[in-house]
Regions:
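N-terminal core-binding DNA-recognition domain of tyrosine site-specific recombinases/integrases
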Residues: 3-86, 103, 206-213, 228-234
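Phosphate-coordinating loops and pocket residues in cytosolic domains that bind phosphorylated ligands
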Residues: 8, 12, 46-49, 119, ...
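DNA breakage-rejoining catalytic core of tyrosine-based enzymes
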Residues: 45, 84-90, 98-119, 167-188, ...
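C-terminal catalytic core of tyrosine-transesterase DNA break-rejoin enzymes
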Residues: 65, 131, 135, 141-142, ...
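Basic, Lys/Arg- and aromatic-enriched nucleic-acid-binding interface segment
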Residues: 67-70, 83-146, 154, 236
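Active-site/catalytic core of tyrosine-dependent DNA strand-transfer enzymes
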Residues: 111-112, 163-166, 186-228
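Short, polar N-cap/turn motifs at the start of nucleic acid-interacting alpha helices
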Residues: 150-157, 229, 248-268
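C-terminal secondary-structure termini that scaffold catalytic or DNA-interacting sites
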Residues: 155, 166-184, 189-191, 264-267, ...
Length: 290
């Protein structure tokens, strides 16, 4: 069996039946398709980590993130092949090191820009969803998936339980990616009153719209208020950045964002806390000896 044949078999028998998120399935499909012909035609039992590393190094020179995802596909598919006795290759950090990828720094709004954004987007149909992305740090799919049943008026809480994604030709509610993404957020009274005033949809969604229309409303606000090209996901980064800068504890921010680990939150946003150079002044102020 050639490597390309095994990858197609693995995709059909192990990826598709697993009911993964559509984006994850698409990622595996792209990675399988990306395997070059010279590598795919090699016999599975004869493929070595050296050949795989040679390919990943080539990919990483152009697109490091794609190389990372290609490695994930290879690692998981060949792990299954090894369990089935189809190959004996050892895939680990030594034989097939994870390609390094430093993501571009996300563009975010300043406090003043965020205010202008809210004023500009207030007249658009997706206003409430975009406001929740900015104030609560919701992901776009999470905002689109919000239903009236997710809102507890008495407790003033919003519970994130699903995300809305395109599946085939329609939009469907899908499970969140991780347990940590399930979370309840305490909303300010003003925001809760705004949600209560929202017209109730027949479908049960807080706002029944699409990612395309939501993006259209977002771009309208960006252009009309002459703001930097922050993305919808950048609204989430803005919330986290402003919260960290205001002194919000990282553990609390992790919970609010639905991150699976504290380290992920700290790596992304710790730099927005007060710089180490400010420590002496804070200690001196705390002593208040003069």
């Amino acid at each position: 069996m050639r490597l390309s044949q095994w990858l197609e078999t693995w995709f059909s028998l192990y990826v598709l039946p697993a009911k993964l998120a559509p984006s994850t399935v698409a990622m595996y499909r792209r990675a399988v398709n990306a395997v070059p012909k010279w590598l795919g035609e090699m016999e599975l039992a004869q493929v070595t980590a050296l050949e795989l590393q040679r390919w990943l190094v080539q990919v990483a020179r152009q697109t490091p993130r794609a190389a990372q995802l290609d490695r994930v596909m290879l690692s998981r598919s060949l792990h299954v092949a090894g369990k089935l006795g189809l190959c004996s290759m050892v895939i680990d950090q030594d034989t097939l090191p994870k390609p390094q990828h430093v993501p571009d720094k996300a563009l975010v709004f300043t406090q003043a820009e965020a205010r202008r954004y809210v004023e500009a987007v207030a007249i658009r149909p997706s206003y409430v969803l975009l406001l929740l992305c900015l104030v609560c740090g919701l992901r776009r799919g999470e905002a689109l998936g919000l239903r009236w049943s997710d809102i507890d008026v008495e407790a003033s809480t919003l519970t994130i339980t699903h995300q809305r994604q395109r599946v085939g030709g329609s939009y469907q509610l899908r499970p969140l990616k991780s347990t940590a993404a399930h979370r309840s957020l305490l909303l300010p009274p003003e925001l809760m009153r705004l949600l209560q005033a929202q017209h109730r949809t027949m479908t049960g969604y807080l706002v029944d719209t699409t990612p395309e229309l939501m993006r259209k409303d977002h771009l309208f606000a960006i252009r009309s208020a002459h703001l930097p090209p922050v993305t919808i996901h950048g609204l989430r980064h803005t919330m986290a950045t402003l919260s960290a800068g205001a002194g919000c504890p990282m553990k609390l921010l992790q919970s609010a964002l639905g991150h699976s680990t504290y380290q992920l939150t700290a790596d992304l946003y710790a730099a927005h806390l007060l710089p180490p150079s400010a420590a002496p002044a804070l200690v001196w102020q705390g002593l208040a000896v003069i």
